[in-house]
Amino acid sequence: MEGELSGLPTVVFEHHAHIYLGGKNVELYHFGRAHTNGDVVVYFPADRTLAAGDMFTFGDATPELIDYAGGGSAKEWATTLDSALQLDFDTVVPSHGVVTTKAEMRKYRNSTLALRNRVHELIVQEKTRDEIAKVMQTEFHWAQLHLDVSLNGAIAEMQ
């Protein structure tokens, strides 16, 4: 590539923006916290397609990763997905996994809600961090990375 690229964004918005790419209307939305506090969805209304970024991953090998250092939230994730699900689309491009459907994104939303509720339930039962970690691994397929990045924050947020 020629010239210098600063890496800085050229479009900045708080909640919603319209841009045109290749003659197509594209809508950008920030609905709230999920994987981070900066998750943005890119909506192509004419194509009924949503690029969901890291707020939605698809496939068993890609469970929820709550990036607390980046402002993520287990508590708010499902609500953020609810807002995105209000858009009129059929096709979803996740950040990880294959292109899929709105129905699969709705299942993922339910999983984020189940995760949030389960962590809260385990805290109420006064389970230890290690006991909660085991549940996250067995019920939600969390790998060591998820435990390292997300578990302490999820416990703190759900208390």
Annotate each predicted stretch with a short phrase:
Residues 18, 25, 30-114:
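Metallo-beta-lactamase
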Residues 3, 66-67, 130-132:
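Alpha-helical interaction segments
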Residues 1-18:
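Active-site HxH/HxHxD metal-binding segment of metal-dependent hydrolases
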Residues 86-88, 99-159:
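Accessory terminal helices/loops
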